[in-house]
Amino acid sequence: MKRLMMAAAFVAGAAACLPAAAQFQKPEDAIKYRQGAFTVMAAHFGRVAGMAQGRVPYDAKVAAENIAVVMAVSKLPLTAFGEGTDKGAPNRAKPEIWRDAAGFKAAADKYVAELAKLDAAAKTGTLDALRGAVGAVGGTCKGCHDDYRAERYSQ
């Protein structure tokens, strides 16, 4: 619960910074911002995925709380992919993010749409509904990573 509260504080602080893109003084600030948001999303989605995969006992309330955090943070990283933020700090963003901005945005929008379905599935309170939706969200993550995230860090 303490971690959930810390994540909620992060979300509240990040939301207060919107529009964040205008506040990045240097490219490395944008890179660190988006990496932080992705780290929070991965941690909370990982908890839900663990339940769906049977590695962690299923708890409908905990699943819903974690999904709420992921949904709150899900749109934040996009504000940090502005022009010139491909370099400045070690990161794994491929040049295709900027070359194919429309495709990148479409992939992000698909992720957000699948998250909404995951949220609805979690509200049913059934593990079976959650399992299918977790797989769909994971598929959007993989698709975006395959196209837009490099395997190694670059600067």
Give a label for each model feature.
Residues F24-A60, N66-Q155:
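Sequence context surrounding c-type heme c attachment/ligation sites in exported
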Residues M1-A8:
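Bacterial N-terminal signal peptides that target proteins for export
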Residues A8-A9, V40:
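A periodicity- and composition-biased signal for non-globular, repetitive helical segments
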Residues C17-P19:
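N-terminal signal peptide c-region/cleavage motif recognized by signal peptidases
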